[in-house]
Amino acid sequence: MRIGITCYPTYGGSGAVATELGLELARRGHDVHFISYASPFRLRGFAERVTFHEVTQLEYPLFEQSSPYALALAVKQHEVAKREQLDLMHAHYAIPHAATAWLAKQMLEHEGLGLKIVTTLHGTDITLVGQDPSYYTLTKFSIEQSDAVTAVSAYLRDETYRAFGCGDCEVRVIPNFVSAADYYPPSDDFWRERLAPKGRRVLVHVSNFRPVKRVSDVVKIFASVRKQLPATLVLEGDGTDRDLAEHEVDHLRLRNDVGFLGKVVNV
């Protein structure tokens, strides 16, 4: 098959899963085309049957405060789908990717061409962003207009039905995954001993450090754990709340017990 995949390229679960899925599809003989404003962070180097298409935007004074990225994305999705004869477009994260895929599909149908849309719901696109009044109607419409919809958990599926209704569409649960060939417990304690002294418990938090991830609360909870037993907190990732977490660590006098590793490609 010829498959288009649109995802956010930045550090985060939706982009990571989308990229790993695309790479595995390519290894199985499918042609995969990633479409986004930057190359996904998990897409490193050359991969056979994988092509990246960058979405470029017009720099114009009128758009200084509100660059219409979604429109540029829809145009690029239409362009790639038409030129590469895509069979389907897989939109990861409903806003705006499912909506722009639908717009691209309408342009293709106007030209006598078809395109199937698969939308995967990842979390905050439904529980936070999608339920905001500014996006609610469009999110509901995009889900209902998709040819297939998946969610990464049963909770997210149920929340989609509760918040949006979507009675006419089936949301299938396909949990996130990791490759057991690439991610497996080490055979020794080499890395563990470098993260924490022997005998200490190791707690790990991995995220993009956005407010919804509540990293400062993680630090506060760890402070309670630390009062009960020897432990080390390892924070992997970076984002807007990194400084807030650093401040909380210093405020609770946990600097010797908390490590910030920053962005780590292979966790």
Question: Which residue stretches match the model-derived regions?
Answer:
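Acidic anion/phosphate-binding donor-loop and adjacent secondary structure
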Residues: V129-G130, Y161-R162, F177-R194
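Conserved donor-binding/catalytic core segment of Leloir-type glycosyltransferases
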Residues: T150, R192-K213, V219-R226, V234
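An amphipathic, basic-hydrophobic alpha-helix
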Residues: L62-L88, A98-A99, L103, P133-T137, ...
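Carbohydrate-associated surface elements
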Residues: A38, Y155, F177
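Nucleotide-activated donor-binding/catalytic signature segment of Leloir-type glycosyltransferases, i.e.
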Residues: E246-V264
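A short, glycine/small-residue-rich beta-strand->loop->alpha-helix junction that serves as a flexible
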Residues: I5-T19, K213
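N-terminal strand-loop element at the rim of the active site
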Residues: C7-Y11, L23-Y69, G239
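Nucleotide-sugar donor phosphate/pyrophosphate-binding loop at the beta->alpha transition
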Residues: L108-V118, T124-S142, D158, P186-S187
